[in-house]
From Swiss-Prot:
Residues 145-173 are annotated as: Disordered. Residues 38-113 bind DNA. The keyword Metal-binding applies. Residues 149-165 have a biased composition (Polar residues). A zinc finger (NR C4-type) spans 41-61, 77-96. Keywords: DNA-binding, Metal-binding, Nucleus, Receptor, Transcription, Transcription regulation, Zinc, Zinc-finger. It comes from Danio rerio (Zebrafish). Gene3D superfamilies: Erythroid Transcription Factor GATA-1, subunit A (3.30.50.10), Retinoid X Receptor (1.10.565.10). Transmembrane segments: none annotated. This is Nuclear receptor subfamily 6 group A member 1-B. The keyword Iron does not apply. GO terms for molecular function: estrogen response element binding; hormone binding; nuclear receptor activity; protein homodimerization activity; sequence-specific DNA binding; zinc ion binding. GO terms for biological process: animal organ development; anterior/posterior pattern specification; cell migration; midbrain-hindbrain boundary development; neurogenesis; regulation of transcription by RNA polymerase II; response to lipid. It comes from the Eukaryota.
Length: 455
């Protein structure tokens, strides 16, 4: 596409001036304050919220460091591994951000082993680690050795509560990060979903109840038959040379969302357990999960159309300078999350059967108040979790961690879709243009670089 000849079509670094906040010196670990008594993050210069993992830092860098270590993420720098860190630039290079965290003394041993909020030991201070150890962490070598050790425990707990967001397949690494705070993620991941997610690493108890006795292959066939896997009918074709306006692209995005939502309603009514649930329960479940279902559909069965036809339409949209300036940090984080999800699901290559199971799991695992038949919903939830795991193990016996990778993606979908709901409508055209441009060109930082890298 023509867009590939414009390497910096979206140079977000130009939309903000550099911060004027006073940064700490690279080797200073003291709790310094300015005349007003405020403290600044050692990593990015944002206002610090306290002592986190041994050093003074902000909530964003605290959460980023925790996710990077707990999820064993591996990043790449497209430049010289010396990118500037500031509050508004910290999201642009996760490699340099994590490297700065380690250089400034953030202590990974202060992270709780269960991965939950709260330091493991408030008295643990900053640490100094060698350049060799930093390189081992940044390259993922230390994570790999730790993973090999934990794999030798047949049923033992690993050092982290959730599978990593780094996926290695065919010698290529995929990673994800954003600067959202831990508290934001805690709000988006319900206790019910977190509990079930943790349970998925270990054998679930066998399902009970007459409604759960359907054979696995029969049940899989039933929910697959309920799916409408045909291409989207919303027109996404455009003539060459036509300039798409912001309102036109927004109308198209709304049209696609409307069609996907309608398909979810039809799908729900076809599910084998639909008649066993009250209309009230079905309405509440769909009302709390529709945005997750739409996102899941977009990045799996409809990804070819989204990355093809829709990406071509967004290519003909040119945002104004005003729109670029108003593209906030929340939108940047969503963009990063969507990039990750598109890439990871592409590598996972989810089958239609797995997709059907994941949709059902997403529908049933909602922390919704006012449900009538909670006991049946719990049984159904356990049944479809087990079904999905059995299906994944049968289709991919050589990849025992595949199910955990998939469930990690569901958690990310839950968070990202919720975050998208807070993005102003007028920012959505630019958001999708940036995401689809990144996913369809080698601008994506997770794509392997063959010879040269763009800056």
């Amino acid at each position: 596409m023509e867009v590939e000849n414009r390497p910096n079509t979206y140079d977000f670094s130009k939309r903000d001036k550099l911060l004027s906040n006073r940064f700490y010196e690279e080797n200073s670990l003291q709790d310094e304050t300015d005349d007003g008594g405020e403290r600044w993050c050692l990593i990015c210069g944002d206002r610090a919220s306290g002592l986190h993992y041994g050093i003074i830092s902000c909530e964003g860098c605290k959460g980023f460091f925790k996710r990077s270590i707990c999820n064993k993420r591996i990043y790449r720098c497209n430049r010289d591994k010396n990118c500037q860190m500031s509050r508004k630039q910290r999201n642009r290079c996760q490699y340099c951000r994590l490297q700065k965290c380690l250089q400034m003394g953030m202590n990974r041993k202060a992270i709780r082993e269960d991965g939950m909020p709260g330091g493991r030991n408030k008295m643990i201070g900053p640490v100094h680690i060698s350049l060799e150890e930093i390189e081992r962490l940044m390259s993922g070598q230390e994570f790999k050795e730790g993973s090999d050790l934990s794999d030798s425990w047949s049923h033992g707990y690993s050092n982290h509560s959730s599978p990593g967001n780094s996926l290695s397949e065919g010698g290529q690494s995929l990673s994800f990060s954003s600067s959202r705070s831990v508290s934001c993620r805690d709000e988006c991941i319900s206790p019910q979903l977190t509990h079930t997610f943790l349970m998925c690493k270990y054998p679930l108890p066998p399902p009970t109840g007459s409604i759960l006795k359907t054979q696995t292959h029969t049940l899989t066939g039933q929910i697959l038959a309920d799916e409408d896997l045909t291409p989207l009918t919303t027109p996404m074709l455009i003539e060459d040379g036509y300039s798409v306006t912001q309102s036109e692209l927004l109308a198209l995005l709304c049209g696609i969302a409307d069609e996907l939502l309608f398909r979810q309603i039809v799908w729900l009514k076809r599910l084998p357990f639909f008649t066993d649930l009250s209309i009230k329960d079905c309405t509440r479940l769909l009302g709390s999960s529709w945005h997750q279902l739409i996102l899941l559909s977009s990045i799996t069965v409809h990804s070819a159309q989204i990355l093809g036809e829709l990406a071509n339409v967004t290519h003909h949209y040119t945002p104004s300078s005003h729109t670029l300036q108003r593209f906030g940090e929340d939108a940047m984080e969503v963009m990063e999350s969507l990039n990750f999800l598109f890439r990871k699901f592409h590598q996972l290559n989810i089958s239609n059967e797995e997709y059907s199971c994941l949709k059902t799991i997403t529908l049933l695992n909602q922390e919704t108040t006012g449900l009538c038949n909670t006991s049946m919903l719990k049984q159904l939830s356990e049944r479809y979790w087990t079904l999905c795991r059995e299906l994944t193990e049968r289709l991919h016996p050589q990849r025992p961690k595949r199910f955990s990778d998939i469930i990690t993606c569901l958690t990310e979908i839950r968070h990202t879709s919720g975050k998208m709901m807070s993005i102003p409508l007028e920012q959505l055209p630019l958001l999708f243009k940036a995401v689809l441009y990144s996913c369809t060109t080698n601008q994506n930082p997770w794509l392997p670089k063959s010879s040269t890298s763009r800056t």
